[in-house]
């Protein structure tokens, strides 16, 4: 699996703010292509974020999120994720 982080700061995990609740949700991508595509879309949205893709064990990142009560979403090849207006790390 893959996540997005701040470039050279893997502890700065990228998250999306859910509009209705304000919850931060970490997208966890099953496929590198989907992660790359999303990162490109973010850069084209002129977010001023310098992101990098990190390959990570899915069980590890899911467990880390659950341990911290951090919401997450598994992005499969069948999902379409488009960057929202409110991007947060």
Stretches with model-predicted labels:
Residues 1-89:
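Conserved NAD+-utilizing ADP-ribose enzyme module
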């Amino acid at each position: 699996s893959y996540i997005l982080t701040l470039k050279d700061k893997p502890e700065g995990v990228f998250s999306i703010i859910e509009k209705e609740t304000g919850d931060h949700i970490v997208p966890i991508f099953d496929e590198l292509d989907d992660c790359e595509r999303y990162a490109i879309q973010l850069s084209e949205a002129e977010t001023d974020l310098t992101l990098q893709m990190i390959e990570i064990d899915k069980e590890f990142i899911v467990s880390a999120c659950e341990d911290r009560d951090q919401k997450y979403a598994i992005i499969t090849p069948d999902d379409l994720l488009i960057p929202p207006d409110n991007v947060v790390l």
